[in-house]
């Protein structure tokens, strides 16, 4: 029997609750399947670790998880610690050195969930957003000078490379090719940003020739927000820069009903490093410890993890279980307008997994 080693990193806030729920569900799924198992190694990195040690994770933290098959992550963010410290000290400290350059965020309206778009019932909104996850606006290149003085200045340099842009656009074309519609939208801001964004457009046109069976178009990012709201059915696979896709994917999650159900995969497609899977929602300290966090985003992220590991049947079973639960309004958490809690939803998904008719 294959045993997968999973690094479980809850992080901060409700991360502990949703990752714990995810571990329970994955254990139940493995027991139901019977052909594979999980070994979960738990790491207490995050804001509380920072308060004790002055850093978000140990100096040898990456070495500790380097040989795991995958990483299940919760959230990064602590009300007593600056956001740039929590993000760069933990999540990005894993993503970038592990070259998880493809951030993949599927978006669709699950059964039983209502979109705020009044004309959309479900099939019209079925997207996958591909976010460049290693460079661009979040390259970490920049600095501050003359701090505290009237002449203080700061820069954040958006660093784009031909290699980085080429690999994410090629990844997006391959993903679009694997989907029924075979359609890709490339999002930039090349009308105003005339160097790196123009390079994106040019590289997209070059790589498109490798995929003659994939139709594609390009959009300016501000116009893209309108298209997502007004013509969601016109979109399928979307690729954009680190910053642009970060923003667009949050909009997408809201249009699909809630950030609480949205998943993310941070992929190293070549398999040289472990990939990381996490819900989109943040640490949500306002509801921490109340048992109100929606675990569906973590469960859906676990589906993506299973698919990445090659456990296609188990991934499909878990997705069906999730959809069976979301279809019941009585199992909706407060972010979806319901009164269910994390425990109730987790138990329901486990019950669906073990049901004979799934």
Where are these regions (language model features)?
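Buried hydrophobic positions in well-ordered alpha/beta secondary-structure cores of metabolic enzymes
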Residues: 12-15, 69, 130, 172, ...
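Short glycine-rich or small-residue beta-strand-to-loop segments that form or flank ligand, phosphate
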Residues: 5-14, 72-77, 184-190, 300-307
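Glycine-rich phosphate/pyrophosphate-binding loop and the adjoining helix
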Residues: 140-186, 190-194, 312, 317, ...
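N-terminal glycine-rich phosphate/adenylate-binding segment common to multiple enzyme folds
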Residues: 50-155, 243-245
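Buried hydrophobic packing segments
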Residues: 22, 26, 204, 298-306, ...
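N-terminal beta-loop-helix "entrance" segment that forms/cooperates
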Residues: 35-58, 228
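Glycine-rich phosphate/diphosphate-binding loop of Rossmann-like nucleotide-binding domains
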Residues: 7-24, 28-29, 33, 149-221
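Glycine-rich phosphate/nucleotide-binding loop
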Residues: 47, 104, 227-330
């Amino acid at each position: 029997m294959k045993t997968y080693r999973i690094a479980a990193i809850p992080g901060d806030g409700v991360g502990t609750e949703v990752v714990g729920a995810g571990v329970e569900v994955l254990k139940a799924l493995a027991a139901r399947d019977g052909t594979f198992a999980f070994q979960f190694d738990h790491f207490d990195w995050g804001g509380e670790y920072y308060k004790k040690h002055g850093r978000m994770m140990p100096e040898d933290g990456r070495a500790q998880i380097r040989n795991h098959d995958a990483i299940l992550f919760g959230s990064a963010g602590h009300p007593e610690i600056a956001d740039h410290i929590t993000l760069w000290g933990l999540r990005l400290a894993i993503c970038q050195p592990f070259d998880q350059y493809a951030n993949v965020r599927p978006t669709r309206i699950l059964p039983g969930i209502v979109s705020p778009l009044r004309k959309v019932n479900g099939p019209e909104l079925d997207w996958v957003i591909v976010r460049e996850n290693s460079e661009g606006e979040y390259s970490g290149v920049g600095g501050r000078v003359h701090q505290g003085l009237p002449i203080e200045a700061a820069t954040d340099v958006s660093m784009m490379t031909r290699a980085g842009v080429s690999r994410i656009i090629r990844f997006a074309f391959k993903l679009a090719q694997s989907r029924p519609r075979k359609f890709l939208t490339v999002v930039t801001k090349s009308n105003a940003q005339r160097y790196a964004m123009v390079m994106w457009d040019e590289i997209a046109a070059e790589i498109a020739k490798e995929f003659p069976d994939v139709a594609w178009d390009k959009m300016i990012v501000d116009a893209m927000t309108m298209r997502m709201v007004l013509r969601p059915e016109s979109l399928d696979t979307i690729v954009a820069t680190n910053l642009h896709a970060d923003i667009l994917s949050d909009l997408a999650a809201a249009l699909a009903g809630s950030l609480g159900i949205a998943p993310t995969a941070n992929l190293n497609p070549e398999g040289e490093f472990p990939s990381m899977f996490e819900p989109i929602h943040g640490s949500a300290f306002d509801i921490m410890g109340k048992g109100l966090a929606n675990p569906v985003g973590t469960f859906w992220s676990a589906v993506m993890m299973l698919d990445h590991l090659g456990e296609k049947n188990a991934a499909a079973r878990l997705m069906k279980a999730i959809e069976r639960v979301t279809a019941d309004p009585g199992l909706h958490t407060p972010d979806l307008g319901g009164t269910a809690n994390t425990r109730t939803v987790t138990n329901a998904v486990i019950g669906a997994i073990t049901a004979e008719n799934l």
